[in-house]
Amino acid sequence: MLCVLLLAACSGKKSGSEAYVKVLPDNSLAIVKMDLGKFLDESEILGNTFIKGAAGKGIGSLPENMRPLLQNIYDNPAASGININAPMYLAVANVDPVSMVITMDMDNMEAFENALLTFGMGEIEVIEQDGMKHIVTGEDEVACAYDSDKLIVVVDDRYADIATYTELAGDDMAVNDKRFEKLFEGDDDQAAVYDLGAFGKELVRSGEVEPEFEPYIKMLKGCVMYSAANFEKGYACQNVYVDMPEESREALDKLMKKPTRRHFGYIPANSFAVFNCNLDLTSADKLLESADVKEMLEENGITEDTAKEILKALSGEYTAASWVDGDDVENIQGMVVVDCNDRLVFDMLVSIVNSECDATIVDSDVYALNVNKREQYNYYTYEYETVTKGSDYYLMYKNGVIMLLPENLYNEICATGELKPLADNIKKNRQFDSMGNLMVDFKPARDAALVYMRNDSSSDVKVLFEVLDMLKSFTLDFNLYSYESRLNVNDDSVNSLKYLTDKIISIVVQNGGF
């Protein structure tokens, strides 16, 4: 019953000045805002034919005295008594033991109480205490209370006490804390604020973090992360930003720079996923002062000076890509390209590779990894023989870059012995013009699934194709303290949430749901 009323707690654009948000403590590790009403409005899920049919069956199965009320709440969620123009908030005060509070804005206490008692079928007891009406749960770990301003649910592994949150002083309220200001004033569909420093401190205190990682967790002191998600026409997006001391931000800006895409000429045009970033690892040499890092270097026979040379050599562009080889959807290939201005690092890498596999020299600074070869026992000859399946991978060092790539791509890029851009490279795929650090183009994957369906018409493959058919592309643009992701769908004429909701419900129905 309470779940029904929670779902009816819907959206709005209110600020954080209402009484119901004053129960959120400022020492919260995290506060999440859930705009369920906006979800209902944008998805139009309650108007979906299949959902209405399923809801009708569910309501029809209830006792007769409940049906009119629940149907009324389904048709008009405001009839639940909860303010449909205000978001619901969840604050986490502790992780071990768990302690959290959920609060919603009360619009009509009489309507809420009527719904509560009707669905409770005489089994719910309500008592008045300290100016609020308390729902008797029979559990020490869960408490629920309401008045004309708010509905509060408290969950605490030790003892759930409503008064802990209703008697907060002004300075102890999150609504008066600048860390949470954007959360209360913003109009995002869904949003959350995480105090990373407090989270880290709590994890250390509870013993969830191994001692050797404590110094890194302590580096989060003063860092607060804000996350927001929104659904727009044609796409859904999420933005995350970590507010941190200026000194820390400047250090991270030095470590990660804007990518130049200088390796894109080597990436096949039919790639469905490409990753690209630009790192200046010399700015991370302070990590070498860590006792744990020093111990790791000593175990591998690497001096601190050599480690600094490695960081310097590997500073630059990093690019990786994946694609389907022809029509063989089970043969997904990939490549990695890394800037390296010192062949010493390549020699070290070759040494590591040789310890793991039987690499052979193909050309100067080119090694075949022989990953497509394996020993197989021949029952006719009673001997083991080498069997080759699929494409081998090559590891090479040329023109200041290290490349790991399939044999067939190597033959095209290095046909003359020197690096040569592909005639059909990713720059010709306009989808990737808008990419930041990562992009996934779902069309090649969708085409591959379509080919696969010719040989396998099982429901699982059909579902995979239907899911891929909803999506156009995914992009991710990030640095070390913020990122923006965007999921583009194949219809930009409607809100992406409605589009995805309708499609997913349709897939469920086709596979026997509802």
Task: Show which residues each predicted segment covers.
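Sec-dependent bacterial lipoprotein signal peptides
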Residues: M1-A8
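Extended terminal
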Residues: S434-F514
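Short, solvent-exposed coil/turn segments at beta-strand boundaries
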Residues: D96-P97, D107, Q129-G131, C144-V153, ...
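A conserved glycine-rich beta-strand in the N-terminal activation segment of trypsin-fold
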Residues: H134-S206, V387-M470
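Short Gly/Thr-rich strand-loop-strand
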Residues: M106-D147, R343-K398, D433-Y452
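Solvent-exposed coil/turn segments that connect beta secondary-structure elements
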Residues: G37, M106-M109, D149, D157-R158, ...
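Structural boundary/hinge residues at secondary-structure and domain interfaces
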Residues: C10-G138, A174-M225, G234-Q333, L344-D358, ...
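Extended, amphipathic alpha-helical scaffolds
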Residues: K308-T319, W323-E330, N341, D358, ...
